[in-house]
Amino acid sequence: MIEIKNLHAEVNGTPILKGINLEIYPGEVHAIMGPNGSGKSTLAKIIAGHPDYTVTKGEIFYDVNFKKINILDLEPEERAREGIFMAFQYPVEIPGVNTSVFLRAAFNEICKHQGAEEMDPMDFDDYLRSKMKLLSMDDKFLNRPVNVDFSGGEKKRNEILQMAVLNPHFSVLDETDSGLDIDSMRIVADGVNKLKNKNNATLLITHYQRLLNYIIPDYVHILRNGKIIKTEGKELALQVEEKGYDWL
């Protein structure tokens, strides 16, 4: 589904990623851990197409709908239409834009790209409410501006609601556990787990092992100084929790 080959990237002329190689297949959950400044969020933002980061070498191939494309050739909105989703560490507030209207516009944009009919407001309302139940979200969210005056937990749940509504092929969750109490983390993790199937894949970016108690990864990768230095199963996260990163 996603193949990252020899990816090098910089910001403001400073090298951040120094040769990332990673393959993620449908049905898999991968987690990337690493100390602060190792390049974890940089990798997430490059996959999403953030303009502040410059790729100096490498490719990111993405298989979808029987075609293989280098997403580095696509604008951020084109990547989203092709089924790539990113949940931000710090979700953006959009004053004046109703959450349900925002989600319906995004959903119908993907429908249009796929050649499907757009969903009318009444049908979309039913669809949206069914997804909200996955995250124990109150109907009051529907009429609130996107992320405005939301608590940290509400913002993260709203990000996963977007993931549920848009049904992406490949999702990147950038430190989704950041700022969450244990109850909110369980709700968010439960929503992510319910969305997992054999046709999609997820990349978790996290600093701590605790999220991986609730979303079990198939593989854990340790990123340090811009390179993946070790890959194993979930037990690697437990070792990092116990020993830190210096032993690697």
Residue locations for each model-derived region?
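Conserved structural motif at the start of ABC-family nucleotide-binding domains
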Residues: I2-I4, L17-G19
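Conserved hydrophobic segment flanking the Walker A/P-loop of ABC-type ATPase nucleotide-binding domains
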Residues: I24-P26
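The feature captures the beta-strand-to-loop junction immediately N-terminal to the Walker
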Residues: M33-P35
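Helix-to-loop junction immediately C-terminal to a conserved catalytic motif
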Residues: A48
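ABC ATPase NBD Q-loop/coupling interface
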Residues: E59-R79, N147
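ABC-family P-loop ATPase nucleotide-binding domains
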Residues: E77, E82, Q89-H169
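Walker B catalytic motif
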Residues: V172-T176, D183
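Conserved beta-strand-loop-alpha-helix hinge in the C-terminal portion
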Residues: Y219, L223, K227-L248
